[in-house]
């Protein structure tokens, strides 16, 4: 009888421990925000709605892609939306979102102008003819953010334009979309910088004449 009672007590204890373990197991879909509150994303994992609903969006460096739609996207059906307030670029196939990626637009004194543009030029390996680095005759950098239009090149020195690979020109006065350092705030000289891991793919999906909306 005592043995039966002991087995029952052990079984009850194990059951209680299992219940406690289940009750305390964290929800993998839940995220603790900075204010201490727990956020549970209401949208299915992997969907664009889920990506945008995350607390770290839009500041995240993460990129969302619809792989199936990406395979169907080419220069005949693509367009880009640049959102200045969120600092995000959206590659679209018609009205459907193909990719959402971080961008970096112009600073307050050199803002990226909103508007609807057509790509005027595409160049894979381009350098700026205005912004870059100034070197002295010994090859030392004397100005890491030089403006060739206003800064004087020292005797024997040189100006080297900043690289702007996978360049897509939007205006003839120097605004374009290209690879560059992506801060999570406006930091460029009016151009729209994009990540090196993203821009070659975006570039491949666009052509001269494709639409880019900056809003």
Predicted feature residues:
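N-terminal pre-domains immediately preceding structured catalytic cores
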Residues: 2-14, 18-215
